[in-house]
Amino acid sequence: MSSQVPIVFIMLAVGLGCGKTEVEPAEISATPPAVQPLIESTPPIVQKELFFDQDNLDHRKIETAINVTLRQKKQQGQASLTGMRIIPRRAWPKLKSGDVLQLTELDVGGKDIADISPLTELSQLKSLFLTENRITDLSPLAGHTQLLSLTLDGNGQLQDLSPLVNLKGLRLLYLDRNHVADLSPLAGLTELKYLYLRDNQVDNLEPLGNLKHLVVLDLGGNKITDLIPLMNLSELKHLSVDDSPYLPQDEIEKLQSALPHCKISHDASE
């Protein structure tokens, strides 16, 4: 046993010596390599499954719209850093929310759909087009707090705007040609700049009185009788109140005096 100890010791010493004399230490850069984030300044989104019911025609139309948008972005080279996955058209997969993380704009207009529940988890959207459909339930949009632009004109029987109450970042909202009467859910959307409410059932403008950043407001074709709530909207530049048979001419004149820089469009006969 005693004769083996120095041999082992010598072998270790030689091994260590070889490491010092023949192998140069690797250079370590003081600057870490740059890493391209998927989306800057945005916390990671928890993966959730998005279900498209193959027996639900509305779901299939929404899936197709998402697919079209993904393909367009892929063709434009916008998916190169994110590994965007295209949904197989006939596979009807369980799509993960992370797969469409890059979608900030989606057009599902003119599809004659009523059920928009598949949009619930796409809360990263900034612009959403849902014009010319049959939507009456907006609850799937309640968590879409990143939306800047929402287009809902031409849905006919849409009345309840309460699911929009927390969309505080909205800048543009199209609601023309619906059946909206109650504007109270919009009272807290103080970042709105462009609001289109033509051809609805609106008769009370009080909820709009605090929307100080409104620049364009279209109220034509409603049941309004006074414009007093708009008197303090100092940034308002364009107001349409044409086709408002219950609105007296003197209301228009009073508002014009209060907001001299606002162009008010109205029927000459009023």
Describe these PLM feature segments.
Residues 22-41:
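Short, low-complexity, disordered segments immediately C-terminal to signal peptides
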Residues 50, 104-108, 128-130, 148-152, ...:
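Conserved hydrophobic beta-strand positions in leucine-rich repeat
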Residues 94-95, 113-120, 135-142, 158-165, ...:
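The feature encodes a structural signal of leucine-rich repeats
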Residues 100, 119-125, 141-147, 155, ...:
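Leucine-rich repeat
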